[in-house]
A protein has these predicted regions:
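Membrane-interface helix-boundary motifs at transmembrane edges
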Residues: 35-36, 65-75, 119-130, 189-203
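Membrane-interface helix-loop-helix junctions at boundaries between adjacent transmembrane segments
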Residues: 69-73, 88-147, 157-164
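Alpha-helical transmembrane segments of multi-pass integral membrane proteins
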Residues: 107-111, 116, 131-152, 172-190, ...
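Predominantly late transmembrane helices and immediately cytosolic-facing juxtamembrane segments
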Residues: 116, 225-238
Length: 238
């Protein structure tokens, strides 16, 4: 366990260093991405997500083996049939109920990010722990909303979030501020639960995410986080 924590500690240190250097370079060159065509930037981000980022999802096959052993299921095809069925079902429901499905997806994503990025420090499974996994992981959702509100709303609009909900976010901006504050509380909660051992890991985690979302557009910030922090952590955990 100590060795794993040491690996995670080195990883977050180098990731934060990479974030600071990339951000400083961007600021000093008056935004290094400003000269880049938006289409090219999106293509690069998509390439990174499909190559590095999705690779951690491809390892679901490894997790499937563990899950099938737990339930004593020998037929591996059952997992893939259910996996594909759920994926198709989500796309179908999304096309019918865009706002509901997107909000549900963001909730699940927040919980996933919170759980996967904390599990190496804390193994608790209480109901309160589950709530705080969700709260902590929501930083990935609310940081871009806080720093780049209009740009993030455009992304949500593309993903079929209703006009009514978009208007609600514009008028009730305090909701975003409150949720961002709560995500900080989530970090403090797990630091406390871990008796403030390895506190620097949680601090650098939060700091790097905030820096990325302050300096870069939501797409770039998420790509860097997803590919070089979250996905690599997931791979290490396996």
């Amino acid at each position: 366990i100590k060795m794993i924590k040491k690996i995670y500690g080195k990883h977050i240190f180098y990731f934060t260093l990479f974030t600071v250097v990339l951000s400083a370079t961007t600021l000093l060159t008056k935004n290094i991405f400003s000269f880049t065509n938006e289409t090219i930037t999106l293509f690069i981000c998509l390439f990174l997500i499909l190559s590095i980022g999705i690779s951690h999802g491809a390892l679901d096959n490894y997790k499937a083996n563990k899950l099938l052993k737990i339930y004593s299921i020998k037929n591996k095809s059952i997992f893939f049939i259910i996996y594909i069925f759920i994926s198709v079902l989500v796309i179908f429901v999304w096309s019918l109920y865009g706002t509901f499905t997107l909000l549900a997806f963001l909730l699940v994503a927040s919980y996933h990010f919170g759980l996967e990025d904390t599990s190496f420090l804390h193994k608790g499974n209480s109901f309160l722990d589950q709530i705080f996994y969700l709260i902590k992981g929501s930083l990935i959702i609310f940081a871009p909303l806080f720093f780049h509100f209009d740009e993030t709303l455009k992304i949500f609009e593309t993903l079929m979030l209703s006009k009514a909900f978009l208007t609600f976010l514009e008028i009730e901006h305090w909701v975003i501020n409150l949720c961002l504050f709560l995500s900080f509380i989530g970090y403090i909660y797990f630091a406390y639960k871990n008796k403030f051992d390895d506190f620097e890991v949680l601090f650098l985690d939060m700091l790097s995410i905030l820096i990325l979302n302050y300096i870069f557009s939501p797409i770039i910030a998420f790509t860097v986080y997803f590919c070089f922090l979250h996905s690599i952590r997931h791979i290490i955990s396996l």
